[in-house]
Amino acid sequence: MTENNPLKKISLLNPIHLLAVGFGSGLIHPAPGTWGSLAGTILGVILLSLLGVKIFLIFTALCFLLGCYLCQKTTADMGVHDHGSIVWDEFVGVFIVLAAIPSLSWQWILAAFALFRFFDILKPFPIRYFDEKLENGFGIMIDDVLAAIYAVIVVFAIQYWML
């Protein structure tokens, strides 16, 4: 019975698996993607406040590249494509949106989190297409990047209308 549970095939002692499941946040149920996004938001706010936007964006790009490998390796180890517990892609997606908000006020942080989750769950075109067609680490990562881009567009629209 345990052989059918993909979570039994990973170890939090393995740094690849630990990062892929968002330091364990992707193991929280229900809604592991939401828990992963929340953990990513908290980490992202801390890093953004310490690094500044430019360095944070470079860090985020590196996290995307690393995530392609982490997600590919962990899905291969689990034997399941894009298992819900893999939330590194949520971390990167919410990092992108956090980099676009004008301030680290609780309102903007909440907006970044909520908008990212909305588009990540809804998966408007072409997000769903990439989510379904690209069955590799890049595919796991890119749908969240696209969801983040949708969220960033809304953040910019809100900023424009607030002026």
Swiss-Prot record:
Main localization, broad class: membrane
Q: Which Enzyme Commission number(s) are on file for it?
A: 3.1.3.27
What keywords are assigned to this protein? Cell inner membrane, Cell membrane, Hydrolase, Lipid degradation, Lipid metabolism, Magnesium, Membrane, Metal-binding, Phospholipid degradation, Phospholipid metabolism, Transmembrane, Transmembrane helix
**Gene Ontology cellular component list:** plasma membrane
- Cellular localization per UniProt: Cell inner membrane
Segments spanning the bilayer are 10-28, 35-51, 92-116, 137-157
UniProt feature coiled coil, ranges: none
Name one process (GO BP) from the record.
Answer: phospholipid catabolic process
Which cofactors does this gene product need? Mg(2+)
**What's the catalysed reaction?**
a 1,2-diacyl-sn-glycero-3-phospho-(1'-sn-glycero-3'-phosphate) + H2O = a 1,2-diacyl-sn-glycero-3-phospho-(1'-sn-glycerol) + phosphate
Q: Which GO molecular function terms does the record list?
A: metal ion binding; phosphatidylglycerophosphatase activity
Q: Membrane topology type, per the record?
A: Multi-pass membrane protein
Recorded metabolic or biological pathway in which this protein acts: Phospholipid metabolism; phosphatidylglycerol biosynthesis; phosphatidylglycerol from CDP-diacylglycerol: step 2/2
Report the Pfam families cross-referenced here: PgpA
Query: Which InterPro entries would you find in this protein's record?
Result: PgpA, PgpA-like_sf, YutG/PgpA
Q: Does the keyword Transmembrane apply?
A: yes
Query: Is DNA damage one of the keywords UniProt gives this record?
Result: no
- What is this protein's function? Lipid phosphatase which dephosphorylates phosphatidylglycerophosphate (PGP) to phosphatidylglycerol (PG).
Q: What's the protein called, per UniProt?
A: Phosphatidylglycerophosphatase A
What's the source species for this entry?
Answer: Haemophilus influenzae (strain ATCC 51907 / DSM 11121 / KW20 / Rd)
What gene is this protein a product of?
Answer: pgpA
